[in-house]
Amino acid sequence: MRGHKQWITALSWEPFHLNYQCRRFASSGKDGAIRVWDVILSQCVRVLTSHTRSVTSIRWGGAGLIYSASQDRTIKVWRASDGVMCRTLDGHAHWVNTLALSTDYAMRVEATSHYDRAKFDPSKPEENAKQALARYQAMCPDGEKLVSGSDDFTLFLWNPEKEKKSIARMTGHQQLINCVEFSPDGRIIASASFDKSIKLWDGRIGNVEYEDQED
C-alpha cells in the first residue's frame, strides 16, 4: 500500500464501534498528508491535506473525527466520512509531537473487566460493536478530550468535537514533550519529556497532580 511521498510517521485504526469490519485506518506522513486506507480494497480512499509541514501524530476518535498533529504547530480536526476539515486547534508555539484521547482505552475491541470479557464473542462482531459503543458513550457523555504535547515544553487539553479554544494550557516541563497518555478511566494524563521527568495531570481540567524527576 503506497501513496505517501515521504516516510510515514503514524497509524490509527477506525474505532471498532464505528466499523466492526475493521476495514479502514489512517496514516500520516512527513509529506504533510493524512491518507485513509481500505484494507479490503488495498487502496487509499481519501487524502486529507491542509498541514504545511510533517504530520507527527494522528488519532481516529470515537465520534468519527480524525485528529492530526503537525510540525506546522497546529492540530487539525477532520470528518472521516468525507474528509472535510472541521477546525484547526492553535496554541502551541513549536512542533506538536504527540496526541492522546481520553477514550483510547474505551475504544479497544475488548473491555478490561472480566464481566465484559466474558460477554465478548468473536463470532458476533455486530453485538461486540454495540458493546463497544456503549463503553465509549459511558466514557465520554460530554465528548472525548484530546491532549497534545509539544516541542514548546507545554501540553494543551482540548474538547475537540466542539471547541477551538483549549480547556487548559499545562506548563511545568523544562524540555520538549515526546509522549502523552490518558489513564484507562480518563481521569489522569501522564506526560513524558526530554527533561527526564514524568508529570501527572488532572484529565478533566489539566491541573498538575504529581511530578517525578530524577535527583
For each feature predicted by the language model, list its residue ranges.
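WD40/WD-repeat beta-propeller blade N-cap
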Residues: R2-I8, T49-V55, D82, D90-V96, ...
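Conserved strand-to-loop turn within each blade of WD40 beta-propeller repeats
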Residues: K5, S27-D31, S68-D72, A80, ...
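A conserved positional marker within WD40/Gbeta-like beta-propeller blades
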Residues: K5-W7, A33-R35, T52, L65, ...
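WD40/WD-repeat beta-propeller blade-loop signature
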Residues: W7, Q21-R24, A33, C44, ...
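WD40-repeat beta-propellers
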Residues: L11, I34-D38, I58, I75-A80, ...
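Loop/turn segments within WD40 beta-propeller blades
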Residues: S12-C22, T52, I58-G64, S81-D82, ...
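A surface-exposed beta-alpha-beta supersecondary segment
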Residues: S102-E144
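C-terminal or late-domain output modules
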Residues: G149, T154, W158-D215
